[in-house]
Amino acid sequence: VFYGGDDLHVDSINVTGWKPLGRKFHVTKSDGSILQELDGIPAYDVYRKYLNIRNDENFFYHTLEFPLFYEHNDTTILRTPVASNADGSITMTSDIDIGSVVRISYGDPGTIIESIRHDSKKIAQFGPDLLHIFSCAARRTFWTDKEPTYEISPFQEIAPSCGFFSHGEFLRTSGNLNQHNVTLVIAAMREGERKEPIGTATLSNENSMLKVPLVSRLATFISVTSLELEEMNMKLEHVNEKLK
């Protein structure tokens, strides 16, 4: 579908809400969507060691909430494991370049809700005539006890909308076209001057969702201690350089 016009205005956002967990890994071997090694060891071994996930038919369902998180082309990218292979490699939803620095991530409801609150205000200020909403099917699975459109409904209250759940979302950032996963991508469009929103964006049961679960507190603890360990290692390297 191609849109054009002398007075057509477009704005776009992407919402993740997944937070990095634990230490960093370097992609040392990959081939397209096949992630072979992280820090020189089979990629599957990382998921087995840190999440105790078995290499069986349930691998996809157990890793769905723990995609890999990294920065690329000035934006955050998530990649979800699809299957584990006999050689210890992992088939991902899309490619990850060799040299990328990745971390395992987890979905934090509070962060997701805060992102939706912030970005829905941005979209409302744009004053769209129409919203195109594309959300990864993995996000639908994440909100297991909610309606499938739970995190989409606030945007639907701003302007008429259409879209679908997807297996990959595309968005151009800083001149680069990026493929996302586990991401909510919204394109807002209008002709002429901004319009007043048809309603106010709200999330049902928002307060109950903001209660911090145990896993979130543990993840914060791990992330902070990992950062402190990295800082200590950097200081030790600096001291060693001085002693040479």
Regions of interest found by a model, annotated:
Residues V1-A159, S166-E241:
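Small-residue-enriched flexible segments
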